[in-house]
Amino acid sequence: MKLGRVLSLTACSVLAASSLFAGSSTMNFPNVYEKECQGCHGPIHQGGVGSDLRPDALKKKERHVLRDAIMNGMQNTAMPKWDHMFSKDDADGMVDWLMDWKDNTNFKLDLDEIKGTWTKLADREELAKKYPNAVDTKSVLDVTFATERDASLVDFIDSTNGKVLSRHKAGFAVHVTVTNKTNPRYAYSISRSGRLTMFDIAAPGQPALASVQVGYESRGLAVSPDGKYVIAGNYTPGGAVLCDAMTLEPLKAYDTSAVINMKGQIESSRVASLADTPYGPYFAMALKDAGRVYIIDYSKPNFPIVGDVPNIGEVLHDAFLNEDKGEDFGRYFMIASQGSDVMGIVDYKEKNLAAKVYTGDKTKPHPGQGSSWFNKTMGKQLHATVSMNVGLVVVWDSNWEIVKKIETSGGGLFIGTAPDTPYLWADTVIGSPETYNEVYLINKETLETDKIVKVGKKEGQLIDAKTKKVLQTWDATQYETVTFPESDPQIGKDKIVKYTDKLGEKVKEPVQPRLLHAEPANHGKWTMISEWTTGRIGIYESDSGKFIKYINNLTTPTFTYSVEHRQHIPGA
């Protein structure tokens, strides 16, 4: 099936059926699912961050329970309330549609079809000659990327002042961005709709250079440390696509439609996390549904799989690498198994499973970018993840033993740190609405929570976690987002959306801010925190946690990526 036609054909195949379940509802269930639900539950309803919504999984549940989950959300999960958008009839209709949904798609990873979508958008070599140095910033290392999930945008921000430089359409629900560490003027993004895009962040306006449709639904992305190759991972069709990092020409497809799972059965698997490593010429590729990790050697002809590490755990998700100094730097690929509540430790050197770190019953580890740092007090390297299902930060050492569990107010998705901050910054974005507006600042030496960033509907606070004393307050007034239509860029053929820092009207009914993903910026002096529900990014002092200012007029900002910071993080 042609990748470019998958979305429209899938929608058409179920559109007629949607009217059968509407009752008195006029909701277009396929369209609503595609826009609002697909990101967490998948295009073929197989689940991911969200639950499996295929009929066989749903038939075990009562319809009224499912309807209530749509209307009221599910506490300590990523499932929000939809009562602002759904009537009870709408929710009943959606449940009926899901219960009777049939997968009529036939996805297969085909390298020739993928090559047919490869598109040149600007002349890379000409731009490099014309603009040998960064134009819009002092250095390309000053750039921070941000994704606006629901607007399908990649933004480029000058991290030294918070100025939004440009915003680019880059596929539905842009998920991950990375940079080429050998030549950091080149950046890449992957959207959940399977579009891989390459940008030149030194040229004016950060133009898109090329794009290729690697699948229908994608997640992971990694660039080899030698700067030659970029690899993207797919949920649908299962597999990964390796491309030339200077052109995006597709070179090889790794099909995972028939792999051995944890039960010894042959089935298709989605590809979750991907990571390069400075330890050797390897990519790690996590097979989400098979509980195993492939290790690819990109230095050899035809880029073979040279390692196959099985039995890690059920439902593999995101991962990060260790930062132990010396020869073991980047040696271990630490992958979350959300179905088995473990962090699997995959050894690039031995190409085996070195250990499993059990995070606790039903914790569902989700490290996001993860954290690895040297604890001077203990005299050893430590690593940390947050947990989706409970408010818990789990810390372990390089002997793969847990050294501390730190409670927070709710489940999280991201935990980050950097040399210039004394803290681990842990979000609680999957917690309850009463607490998902908090980020915990955990002391990297004492492993105790020192401070909490808490943003209310009108006021933000920095709180001393021990005394509960408010250390700082700031104006957190919410403003309507000022939007612009798509337009043509100064250079290239992609579409951009203009930005203004002019504030819109004050929001009449403010919402609870939902904070996530802390990322260093401005040479480590700042930390950026995204706010999903308010459409802005907060900037804070890295060493103190004090608020500085907001970047407004964004739509569900999610992932941020500092080029300078990630240059020194293995696999990031």
Please give the residue ranges for each predicted region:
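Local sequence-structure signature of Cys/Sec-based thiol-disulfide redox active-site neighborhoods
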Residues: M27-K35
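The N-terminal extracellular segments of secreted preproproteins, especially immediately downstream
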Residues: A11, L20, E36-G39, L242
